[in-house]
Amino acid sequence: MSALEHEVASQPQMWRTAAAMGAEAREALPAAGARIAVVGCGTSWFMAQSVAALREAGGLGETDAFTPTEMPPGRRYDAVVVISRSGTTTEIVRALRAVPPGTPTVAISAVPHSPVVEAAGSSILLESADEQSVVQTRFATTALALFRASFGEDLRPAIADAERALTEPLPFDPVAFEHFVFLGRGWTIGLANEAALKLREACQAWTEAYPAMEYRHGPISVAEPHSVVWSLGEAAPELLEQVAQTGATVVAGELDPMAELVRVHRVAGLLAEAKGLDPDRPRHLTRSVVLQS
């Protein structure tokens, strides 16, 4: 079993841990009403997108999501939250050092005493969610689960759906397809972006991701019988009907969107195995991006 497979299978338990930390996280994270930025690279950026959309939709305050290199210089926030599994990503450390003095900063990481944790004013550690695989799965979803719990959400339905995602048959045979498109709305746009990245990293697949209602504004032109178009969360039935007319296989996600992402993780592992690839060590990638100063 690859490390990826083990880490994917552990997600329901990791989410239970996150749910139990909800009250603690609520105290550590910026208070409701604060104007904040959530910052990450790669997978962590996509989780930041989901966090920002959830926080705003819940009326908890204006929330922006950025990669560290794209934060608008001079823009003021009441607090900045960063997400970094390894705590070693150079751009995140630099972004924290560039935050105006007096602005609270919080790091979400799996590694204590890491450069990111040391650079932040405070931290929330998810050490049990750390991973051996270069490809992130459980750390990302556990961090998002932590935020959802801190916003007051009951995660028990999502955890039950994750158990289903791990045990029920996949909705299609992954090796029969060459092209994968993921659609999201609201907070699931970040998950769609992450789903597409997962298949690119783990199995070198041709993937795309879009806000659901934008898909027919051009991208649908390349959908065909070897395509899977997968909606993470609710999508308009008429859109899915239009996609089906292209000959593509349509998957209308019925589980909690985070649990749908767990199913995507399974697809990534199966496709990597079918292609003879090591999903734990994708080509050209390392656990984190550490730049020379």
Q: Residue locations for each model-derived region?
A:
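Anionic-ligand anchoring segments at beta-strand to alpha-helix junctions in alpha/beta enzyme folds, i.e.
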Residues: 21, 33-79, 177-224, 266-269, ...
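N-terminal amphipathic/basic leader segments beginning at the initiator methionine
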Residues: 1-15
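A general structural motif
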Residues: 161-170, 207-217, 233-234
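Internal, active-site/partner-interface "lid" segment
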Residues: 111-112, 119, 149-177, 277-293
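Phosphate-moiety recognition in structured ligand-binding domains
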Residues: 120, 234-235, 242-293
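Glycine-rich phosphate-binding loops that contact phosphosugars or nucleotide phosphates
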Residues: 34-160, 166, 185, 228-253
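A short, well-structured juxtamembrane/interface segment
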Residues: 17-32, 163-176
